[in-house]
């Protein structure tokens, strides 16, 4: 389903109209959080603080309180794995027009960018993940894999490595880790924020964000909408889209509820994605100009998404709480004519085989459970029991009446910018629904207990997750399998500011869905087992949190065969070291970043996993010389990687971003100005993707700026 232009324009009008009728102020509660005391802070900053602990936000761009899935919100020192929570402010500061949420996630050194303006993909510790494998308000399967909406995002938490034992049952393998977004709620201070943003090229974005609370702060409503349009900083690329989200929450002494309803629509023309390389090539061509597209003007991706999430908690007594989490997501990729350039010689000539390929998914989730506390002698127990079901239907297939299933070939050259797509005009474009391809039903259960000694000096986490999955495919086949996934961990608190931990986790779920760049696109790969071991230490120094960890992950390896089918190929073993730091060095300086060393090997041949660099690092700084001005900077480094089983070396690269944020008043109205120059030196570079022989072209130098009125 998609809106016509008049309906798209009405979204912002509806949000503005709603602002005129909203009054009162606030109490916000998270769907898995304990009772909270909230202080009024300018929108975009972290505002929720646990009244029962000393947990405070780590400056403005990170938070020491982190969502740990079904375990609820926890102090970072009490989580036995590498994790990081970034706030809305980090997205406002560092988000690019092309990638949005990806830039928020990639502040975490565990995360490596694998995205373009068309897909918001990442990898964590050498394993890929897209929106379908992420969580929204604790619910799996609610996000799309394409250019993602971000107007509703308040926080993002990344837990590195497979952690199915502490989250709701997904429908697919999540070896990379757990990524969870939390939606904005109405805050203590009512907000009416109107933003006008320039996104590079001739593209613009208008945003409305309104929050109010009612009935002695019991009920809250947050309305968020945006409109995006224009030619981007990449010459030849055009984007049109809009998002509209409403978040409603309530809280009493015995219950709390959160409902998020959203819709987003995008129409992108000539948006860049991957480059492939012909087998005849003996050297990797240098990266071409990133300021232009290498696709034909008629290539496009048009899709929309409906998203609904519901979370409810009901206090049964002083020691027990029942909870429900439910969600619905419909993704309709009804317009698709596209293909990826394949470079065929050292001169930079390339071809594109175009396909007319529509896709769709319907994902539904429901989970109920009980959580609570009890004691056995001097030991404290914090337990969770949960059962859930995940329904997933996939739709997709080439439209056989167009292009003879990919025979249309566009030709061009990455250096001379020659491009011929004239064969397209011999064929008619077809849009519409997609044929059914598969149905997957996953029934899951979860039991965990965190046992703590006096003063939480020692903590032991023991958890089991089980599920039964049934997959029905269009070829008539029907397969079922069962999986039991243990999670266990131990934490020792040296003192209140230092913790040492060790953990083991396993995951056994359906394989990933093959992407559109491969001949078996849309196929759900067979299930496989993932195991991770991790040891680490966390140190809190004032408002600065340090984490140092060593990890090992084993999982099935994937590769591309000579017919461009993405298949399982032996085992992948990743070993590495991570260091993360987040928080405030001083009242005037915030810092977030770290580094990862990753030794990812293919067990069958001992070679480096395709598209996986050994070294990567990210570091972002926010300097606040006074209360009005913030100077923002970020550096991102990616070390050398290899592709096609070490045939080509992908050069290392480093990029820099620089910007500023300024708060002032105009005629008595508070206004926030933001300006950012991404890729300051305009570097052209290849960006590798984990377990892939294709490469992305890095984003060009892009200047963005915005003005937000706080009415």
Question: What are the language-model segments listed below?
Answer:
Residues 41-43, 48-121, 135-149, 160-166:
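Periplasmic N-terminal accessory/gating domains of Gram-negative outer-membrane beta-barrel systems
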Residues 150-193:
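A beta-strand signature from Gram-negative outer-membrane beta-barrel systems
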Residues 191-193, 198-273, 298-317:
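Transmembrane beta-barrel wall of Gram-negative outer-membrane proteins
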Residues 267-281, 391-396, 491-534, 539, ...:
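Surface-exposed extracellular loop regions of Gram-negative outer-membrane beta-barrel proteins
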Residues 313-315, 321-327, 331-339, 526-598, ...:
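Membrane-embedded beta-barrel scaffold of Gram-negative outer-membrane proteins
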Residues 361, 380-392, 434-555, 584-586, ...:
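Structural signature of Gram-negative outer-membrane beta-barrels, strongest in the C-terminal barrel
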Residues 455-457, 552-554, 568-645, 681-684, ...:
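Gram-negative outer-membrane beta-barrel transporters
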Residues 591, 640, 662-711:
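C-terminal beta-signal and adjacent terminal beta-strands/loops
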